[in-house]
């Protein structure tokens, strides 16, 4: 018996300022994961005016998000609008690596990923590259051919930019770091049983990695390991929390035992949110906001 998948978004923010007939100077930001899909619209004034968050937790292991997306797109006022100034698609996957620009060779992109994964990419995937020009490195990540083809068909002759989720987080935390009064800062982004750790020092990205964990004890161990690896005392730098974490979560309770400088993060100042976003926790959608800040 086929699994029934709920197509209604768990979170929806719409503003009266969004006009689907005037998208030529607006940016459509989409984030795609194994069982989730999110969208954000940055309008002509640089303001985030729409947000939707879909979660397809009932997808079985042999089902793919691509099988659900056509139903989400069908008759969707925003997704079927256009043409857009740009469409930015964040890929939320476990396979990525950052390569310093002087060492990067395009013909070795798949090899970089194979070295990181410990195995070759499967036939239905390829290595995609995004350049962080201001920071002097490139992000290499896996992208599925069917997913790439689907978005290319949905938005023909429109500028598509594919990035890894970590690239959006790098962009968002770079914006936060530029306005920070401290010499260094650590940013933690939580999602399901993963945490992405970013460490900025002297306005340079010194560390970026993603860890999977099964319990909060493992989570605390990984964070303390990173601090030790970077020669940082537990209270030496402020640590900002983003994503799926709350003051009442088990993860927060465990981390607060060891880390005295925890705080919940804020929206990057480079992106303005419409008043309708006021009910959302500021720290919740950092990767989506980072897509809105790309190239800023």
Predicted regions and their residues:
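Small-residue (GG/TT-enriched) beta-loop-alpha framework at ligand/catalytic clefts
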Residues: 2-8, 36-37, 129-232
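N-terminal basic/disordered segments at the start of proteins
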Residues: 2-46
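Active-site neighborhood for divalent-cation/phosphate handling
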Residues: 6-8, 49-59, 68-174, 270-272
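Short glycine-aspartate micro-motif
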Residues: 27-31, 88, 185-189
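Short glycine-rich, Thr/Ser-proximal phosphate-binding strand/loop in the N-terminal lobe
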Residues: 34-64, 202-217
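N-terminal phosphate-binding loop and adjacent alpha-helix
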Residues: 50-79, 217-231, 237-240
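Glycine-rich phosphate-binding loops at beta-strand->alpha-helix junctions
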Residues: 238-258
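Glycine-rich phosphate-binding/hydrolytic loop that grips phosphoryl groups
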Residues: 263-296
